[in-house]
C-alpha cells in the first residue's frame, strides 16, 4: 500500500490558484496546509482569496499561513491586470471565511519540514506563486531539505517565451533571487 505524503500548497491567490485549489479538493488531494505569498495580488488579498476558496470548496478546516509580502531584493509587482483588483476577477464572496492559522508561513515551513525529517518522512510542496516563502525558509534553515519531498513548481519557461516579459515567467520574475535559491537547492524539483 502506497502512502500519500502530506502536501503544502504555496500560492499567490489569483484566479489560476483558485482553480488549482478547487481541482485539488475535487480530486481528493486537498492540501494539508496552505502558505500564502504576494504575487498576482498583494499578500492580504491573496490570503483572503485562498480562505474564500476553501470556504466555497467546503474545506474551511485547512490551515492557511500568511507568508512573504514582498520579494527578497526588488520592488513588488502584481498581475492585477489579469486577475482583477481583488485577484478573483470580482467574483462574489461568502459572508464569512475562515481565519488564518498564523502570520508566519516561513516558520511553519521550517517547523513542518524539520519535523518530517526527524520522523523519517517527507512533505511535498506545490508552489504556484513566487518562491519567496520557501527561499526564506531555506536561507534560515538549510537542513529543511531533508524533510522536503517532491517540489512541484508552476514557474519558468521552456523555449524562452515568457508571460511577463518576452523571456520571463511571472512567478520567477516576481522574485528572481528567491527562484535562484530554490532552483539551486538539492531538491527533487518538477516544473509543471
Describe these PLM feature segments.
Residues 65-93:
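Surface-exposed loop and adjacent secondary-structure segments within mature catalytic domains
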Residues 53, 57-65:
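A glycine-rich helix N-cap at a beta->alpha junction
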Residues 2-11, 15-52, 92-192:
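Active-site histidine-anchored catalytic micro-motif
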Amino acid at each position: 500500500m502506497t502512502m500519500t505524503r502530506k502536501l503544502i500548497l504555496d500560492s499567490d491567490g489569483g484566479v489560476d490558484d483558485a482553480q488549482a485549489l478547487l481541482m485539488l479538493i475535487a480530486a481528493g488531494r486537498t492540501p494539508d496546509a496552505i502558505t500564502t505569498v504576494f504575487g498576482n495580488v498583494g499578500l492580504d488579498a491573496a490570503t483572503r482569496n485562498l480562505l474564500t476558496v476553501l470556504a466555497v470548496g467546503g474545506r474551511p478546516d485547512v490551515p492557511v499561513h500568511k507568508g512573504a509580502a514582498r520579494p527578497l531584493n526588488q520592488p513588488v509587482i502584481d498581475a492585477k491586470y489579469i486577475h482583477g483588483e481583488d485577484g478573483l476577477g470580482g467574483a462574489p464572496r461568502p459572508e464569512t471565511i475562515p481565519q488564518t492559522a498564523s502570520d508566519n508561513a516561513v516558520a511553519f515551513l521550517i517547523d513542518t519540514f524539520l519535523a518530517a525529517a526527524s520522523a523519517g518522512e517527507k512533505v511535498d510542496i506545490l508552489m504556484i506563486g513566487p518562491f519567496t516563502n520557501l527561499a526564506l525558509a531555506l536561507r534560515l534553515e538549510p537542513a529543511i531539505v531533508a524533510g522536503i519531498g517532491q517540489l512541484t513548481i508552476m514557474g519558468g519557461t521552456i523555449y524562452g517565451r515568457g508571460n511577463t516579459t518576452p523571456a520571463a515567467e511571472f512567478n520567477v520574475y516576481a522574485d528572481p533571487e528567491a527562484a535562484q535559491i530554490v532552483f539551486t537547492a538539492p531538491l527533487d524539483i518538477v516544473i509543471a
